[in-house]
Structures are given as C-alpha cells and as structure tokens.
C-alpha cells in the first residue's frame, strides 16, 4: 500500500453556495437540496432507514465510492441514531461504513460545507474532530462509543480495490455508488469497480446510484447484479438500484487466511499489559464477554509498566509494509488516546512532539530516506538544528526529523486506567494467575494455573503474554525474542527542565514529568536476557549514549543517574519489527499441508491452486505479541485488528500489510519460495509448557 501523501480537494463555491470540485468540475451535491437528495438516492434507494429494523445481524456494512463532504455518511448516522433511540432492543447495534476518496477535503472546507445542515451539526463536529491527515490508505475512525466504525480509504478507488484483504469479500450490505458523474469522472466508472463491488457484496446486498447511464447499468449487470431503473431525484428522470442475488466467488490467499472466532461470548485473555487491556475493550465494543488472567498482582508489571514512553511512528523510507503499518498505527493511536482523554480516562501525558536526531552518518542516511516522502507537515517534517533546538528548548546539536503529533505518555497509568474501564464494562479479572499449561479438551481450552488454583475452561483464548509467548506448546515455534531493557529515572534540573520535547538519538530522553519531577532516559537492549535486576552498567550506559550522540553541547552533562533509580522490563521482539496478530498457527500442520506449496502455485493448474486449503491454526486460539519497543504506537491498532478478525469484520489495512502481521508469515514466506523452514533453536527459547 502506497502510504505517500495524496492530493487534497481543491474547491470553489457556486452562486448557490454548493461546493464544486476543481479536479472534476462538478458539484458535490444537489443545488436544490443535498440532504433530501441523499435520502432519496442512497438511503431510500437501498431501503433505509426502514431496513434497519429487519437487519438480521448486529452490524450492517455500507460501502461508498466518493466520501466527499461526508453528507451520505452523516445522514445515515443521524437516521441510525434515531433508530437506536426508538428501537433499543433491535438486533442491529452497529454500523460499519467503508468509503473511498481520491481527493479528501481540508477540514476547513468540510466545516463550510457542513454549515448548510444544522440538523447534522452534532454528528459533523465529531467527524471533523477525528478527520485524518491526507495519507493514502485506510484510516479507521471509531464514533458513537464504538457503535459507528468509519473506514476512510484515501486514494484512487481503482488503485485501492486490488489491494484489499479477503476480509472484505462478501461483506457489504449496501453500496452508495456516488462519486462525480460518469461524464466528469470516467476513470472511476469501469468494469474493475463493478466486479469489485460484486466480490465485496453479500448475497442479497444492494446498491443505488444517481446515474442511469447505460454502460453503468450494463457493467453492474455483467458483474452479477440485478439492476432496476427507478425515479431519480428532483428533475433527474431516472436512477439505478439493484441487488446481488448470489455470492460471487472471490480469489483468496488461503495461506494467510484469518479465521473469525466461533464464539465471542466466552473469551479469556492471558496477559496484563496495555495490549491486553486494549484488546479487551475492542472486544467489548462488539459485545464480547471477556475474562482476563494476569500472572502478577496487578496490571502493567511487565514492559507496560514504565513511567514515560515515547509515541511516534517508525518510518524507513521504503514505502513497505512496516512503514504502512506504523503510519496507520500512529495516527490511529493518537485518535484512540485522545478519545480516552475526552472520556475522562486520566493518564500522565504530553503531546509535546518528538524530534529524531541525525547524530551520525548512519542515522542521517536513515532520516534522509524517511524524508524522500513529502509527508504532511502535521505528520513529519525535516528540520534544521536551529529549528529543532527552538522547539526542544535545548540545543539539539543536529538536524533531524520532527513529529509534531508525537509525545510521551505513562504506560503504567494508561494500562491501569484501561483495565479499570474494561472491568467497569463487565470484564472479570483474575490476578496472580500464572498460566502453566494450555490444553484443548473437546470444544474448550483448559487453562491450568498454580497448584492451589482450580483449572479454568473457556471457549476462546487470546495469548498476550509478551516475551513469554513462546513458552506454550502451541506457540513455541514462533520466532520471538526476549529483549531486556533498563530505563533510568533521572531528577530534573533547572537546565533539563527546559526540555520541551522527546529527543530520540541512539536512545531517548523525555521532558520532565510534572507529576514526579523526573525524566526517563533509556533504554538498554539486551537480547535473550529476561532478568529484571538493576544493573549499574546499563544505568551508566543510558547516560553515556546521550553524551556520545550530542558531544557538541554541554547540557547532557546535567543528566545524573547516580541515585540508581530505574526500571527494567522485557520486550517481546521480532526481527522484522512488526507485531504478530491473529490466530495461532499450527506449526506441524502448516509444514505438512504446505510442503509443496511453491510447486502447486508455480506449476499447478488453476483447479489445483484453487484447492489449496486455508492455513492450519489452533482452533479458537489467538495471539498478539512482538510489539517490541513500539507498543504504545502499535497496541491500539493491533487490538482493533484482532477484535475485528475475531468478529469476522472488514480489517483496516491492505492485504500486503496484513500478511506482514500474520503470525505464520516467516514460515509461509519460505514455503512459498520452496525453502526449508527452521524452527526456533532450543538455545533461544525457555522451557515450553
């Protein structure tokens, strides 16, 4: 997925006050009554809002070509909110709205357009508050306490559609086929679009569109839709509506299949860190019943227990799956954390910005690669030594890259607050329950703890145990590494208190936390070491790294680590720096089933390729891990991905990036190339239980 910035919409306003696209030379909505046009063409054209009452599932999925001003979305949201108010016991509880937009509007232009509809003001304000930056790809926005999921895919719809994951196949209940008129936007209205619509639509799903153009009608019919001409809006004589009578076969990549959970009414989460808490909340938003087991006496005793952690994206300038994931993860994390703060969830934090310094030739080369992309300045910007120093409050000694939306937060505070929120929502917590064994018995998982604790049974289990993930029989083949890290807590001084931003070099230094008048500086990186004792050598090394990277200035001498205040945690790391999230793969079954995968794909006939079975996994066993040093950035999105997968929902990343997060990816990559798969060496793993 191309994460490069995209062009925003250029607008003019006609005499009626209607926005006009300069790119397409067409109006965004009717000069007569845009709101009524939306009701007639898109809602009524698909049978809504009347269809809400008879919808048989908890979630209804809409897809749209051309988000524009968001009028269709806002109108649907308002009607759904009214429906939920009038029918609180109805089966339908959530909307999922997927929209593709090539030229997203600036938020100021959105506000001007929304001013025409005061009846939508409360909904429009919430949308604008979370309006994403113009970065290509999917922006997942959660609204109405999770009752509304908005996936905004920025980019050309014809470029995006081939990249979509299998999770969107046969999912859409209703299409709003919008976009500008075919005569104004001929590139969009084509066979590829119509076929993709059919592939993504569930049997019985519908569409509506303002146009009645013959080639559109024929294209939709050829794709598999039954198409009908009906009365158009206002002076327009006709428009098209239709239904997909039967499921359309969609090609898949079965080796990266992401199965849903069979049962979400009895889920056990094993783990007590930030990703465990976020996963619990993401599941609860969908109605899941969650029980959590933590080995410690309270949450955040592992890698999530630090006082301050930096929040900023991981870029590499390669426009690959890693950069795509962390760009999406960072922007999603900021939206999630801001929403929590608005809800009154308190945790120490400062969105003060993060500056990454080019302190030597190697780091300078990396930053130059990152800046090959002309990022929006609100996301990342090249800055000189003078500019960075002015923002930081201290001489940074180097130029570098600045992330204005970054900052720091207290992982321990946040994890405790999230756990409390999940408990308020109904989650049961069992602390001091250290999982000893995991065994599948009949249709449940048996969880065995200490000798004095009774075994527990659950239908579905999620492993989120950090560096301990490889300890279980089902997961010990996964290529995960334990990495010790010691963070030093240093008292502030009049000079250090001037630091206004997080500085990243061959380490990091945070601004002072007003709550305790200390900074955090770190962190050591000891691969394969799971000890958490204090080490004087690592304490001193944390200081020395800062001095080595900024020898031109004197203020780093103010850093005093002599009181030996520190905290040590153990990260769970992966060599490709991407998390693992999804169903736990069955190692032995994967190797047996896919031993000739490369041959079948390269030399087998179409029928043989189509007969390839989905990747073997342990039933009803899921995992999230490998967040490494970037858990604050990645945890919200991986939690959302896992919950969406378990509920069988569309996922908020493209297929290539999701494949790069799949727990079986290292094995599958080798099998696809016909190479042998090597398991973890016994020397690199703890005892498997």
Curated annotation (Swiss-Prot):
Required cofactor names: FAD
GO molecular function: flavin adenine dinucleotide binding; oxidoreductase activity, acting on the CH-NH group of donors; tRNA (5-methylaminomethyl-2-thiouridylate)(34)-methyltransferase activity
Region (tRNA (mnm(5)s(2)U34)-methyltransferase): 1-245
Region called FAD-dependent cmnm(5)s(2)U34 oxidoreductase, residue ranges: 270-689
InterPro entries in alphabetical order: FAD-dep_OxRdtase, FAD/NAD-bd_sf, MnmC-like_methylTransf, SAM-dependent_MTases_sf, tRNA_MAMT_biosynth_bifunc_MnmC, tRNA_MNMC2, tRNA_S-uridine_synth_MnmC_C
Keywords annotated in UniProt: Cytoplasm, FAD, Flavoprotein, Methyltransferase, Multifunctional enzyme, Oxidoreductase, S-adenosyl-L-methionine, Transferase, tRNA processing
Catalytic activity: 5-aminomethyl-2-thiouridine(34) in tRNA + S-adenosyl-L-methionine = 5-methylaminomethyl-2-thiouridine(34) in tRNA + S-adenosyl-L-homocysteine + H(+)
Any one annotated GO CC term: cytoplasm
Keyword Flavoprotein found: yes
Source organism, top-level taxon: Bacteria
E.C. number(s) listed in UniProt: 2.1.1.61, 1.5.-.-
Pfam families, alphabetized: DAO, Methyltransf_30
Subcellular location: Cytoplasm
GO biological process, alphabetically ordered: methylation; tRNA wobble uridine modification
Family: In the N-terminal section; belongs to the methyltransferase superfamily. tRNA (mnm(5)s(2)U34)-methyltransferase family. In the C-terminal section; belongs to the DAO family.
Protein task: Catalyzes the last two steps in the biosynthesis of 5-methylaminomethyl-2-thiouridine (mnm(5)s(2)U) at the wobble position (U34) in tRNA. Catalyzes the FAD-dependent demodification of cmnm(5)s(2)U34 to nm(5)s(2)U34, followed by the transfer of a methyl group from S-adenosyl-L-methionine to nm(5)s(2)U34, to form mnm(5)s(2)U34.
UniProt name for this protein: tRNA 5-methylaminomethyl-2-thiouridine biosynthesis bifunctional protein MnmC
Source taxonomy: Bacteria, Pseudomonadati, Pseudomonadota, Gammaproteobacteria, Enterobacterales
């Amino acid at each position: 997925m191309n994460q490069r910035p995209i062009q925003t919409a250029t607008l003019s306003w006609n005499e009626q006050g209607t926005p006009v696209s300069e790119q397409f030379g067409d109006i965004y909505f009717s000069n007569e009554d845009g709101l009524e046009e939306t009701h007639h063409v898109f809602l009524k054209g698909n049978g809504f809002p009347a269809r809400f009452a008879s919808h048989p599932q908890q979630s209804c999925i809409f897809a749209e070509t051309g988000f524009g001003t968001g009028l269709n979305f806002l109108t649907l949201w308002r009607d759904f909110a009214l429906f939920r108010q009038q029918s609180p016991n109805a089966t339908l509880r959530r909307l999922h709205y997927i929209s593709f937009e090539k030229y997203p509007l600036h938020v100021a232009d959105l506000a001007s357009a929304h001013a025409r509809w005061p009846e939508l003001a409360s909904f429009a304000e919430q949308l604008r508050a979370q309006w994403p930056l113009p970065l290509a790809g999917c922006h997942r926005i959660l609204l109405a306490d999770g009752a509304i999921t908005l996936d905004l895919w920025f980019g050309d719809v014809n470029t995006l559609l081939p990249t979509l994951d299998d999770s969107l196949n046969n999912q859409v209940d209703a299409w709003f086929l919008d976009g500008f008129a075919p005569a104004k936007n001929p590139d969009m209205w084509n066979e590829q679009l119509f076929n993709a619509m059919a592939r993504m639509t569930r049997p019985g799903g519908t569409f509506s569109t303002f146009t009645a153009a013959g080639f559109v009608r024929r294209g939709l019919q050829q794709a598999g839709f039954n198409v009908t001409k009906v009365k158009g809006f206002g002076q327009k004589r006709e428009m098209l509506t239709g239904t997909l009578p039967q499921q359309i076969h969609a090609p898949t990549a079965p080796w990266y299949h992401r199965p849903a959970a069979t049962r979400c009414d009895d889920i056990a989460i094993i783990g007590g860190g930030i990703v465990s808490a976020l996963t619990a909340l993401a599941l609860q938003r969908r109605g899941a019943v969650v029980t959590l087991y933590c080995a410690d006496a309270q949450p955040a005793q592992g890698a999530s227990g630090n006082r301050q952690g930096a929040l900023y994206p991981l870029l590499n300038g390669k426009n690959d799956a890693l950069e795509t994931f962390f760009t999406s993860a960072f922007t999603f994390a900021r939206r999630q954390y801001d929403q929590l703060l608005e809800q009154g969830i308190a945790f120490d934090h400062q969105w003060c910005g993060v500056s990454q310094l080019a302190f030597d030739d190697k780091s300078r080369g990396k930053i130059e690669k990152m800046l090959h992309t002309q990022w929006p300045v609100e996301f990342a910007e090249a800055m000189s030594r003078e500019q960075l120093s002015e923002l930081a409050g201290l001489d940074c000694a180097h130029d570098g890259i600045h992330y204005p939306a970054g900052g720091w937060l207290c992982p321990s505070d946040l994890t405790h607050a999230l756990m409390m929120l999940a408990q308020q929502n109904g989650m049961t917590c069992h602390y001091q329950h250290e999982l000893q064994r995991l065994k599948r018995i009949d249709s449940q998982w048996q969880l065995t703890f200490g000798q004095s604790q009774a075994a527990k049974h659950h239908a579905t289990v999620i492993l989120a145990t950090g560096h301990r993930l490889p300890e279980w029989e089902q997961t010990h083949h996964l290529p995960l590494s334990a990495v010790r890290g010691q963070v030093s807590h240093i008292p502030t001084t009049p000079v250090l208190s001037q630091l206004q931003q997080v500085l990243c070099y061959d380490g990091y230094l945070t601004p002072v936390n007003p709550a305790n008048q200390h900074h955090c500086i770190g962190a050591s990186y000891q691969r394969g070491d799971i000890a958490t004792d204090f080490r004087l050598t690592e304490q001193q090394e944390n200081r020395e790294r800062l001095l080595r990277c900024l020898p031109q200035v004197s203020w780093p001498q103010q850093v005093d680590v002599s009181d030996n205040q520190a905290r040590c945690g153990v990260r769970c790391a992966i060599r490709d720096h991407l998390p693992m999230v999804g169903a736990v793969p069955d190692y032995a079954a994967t190797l047996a089933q896919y031993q000739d995968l490369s041959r079948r794909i390269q030399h087998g006939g179409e029928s043989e390729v189509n007969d390839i079975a989905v990747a073997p996994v342990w039933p009803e066993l899921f995992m999230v891990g490998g967040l490494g040093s970037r858990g604050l950035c990645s945890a919200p999105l991986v939690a959302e991905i896992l919950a969406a997968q378990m509920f069988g929902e569309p996922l908020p990343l493209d297929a290539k990036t999701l494949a790069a997060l799949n727990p079986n990816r290292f094995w599958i990559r080798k099998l696809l190339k016909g190479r042998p798969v090597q398991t973890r060496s016994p020397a690199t793993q703890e005892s498997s239980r």
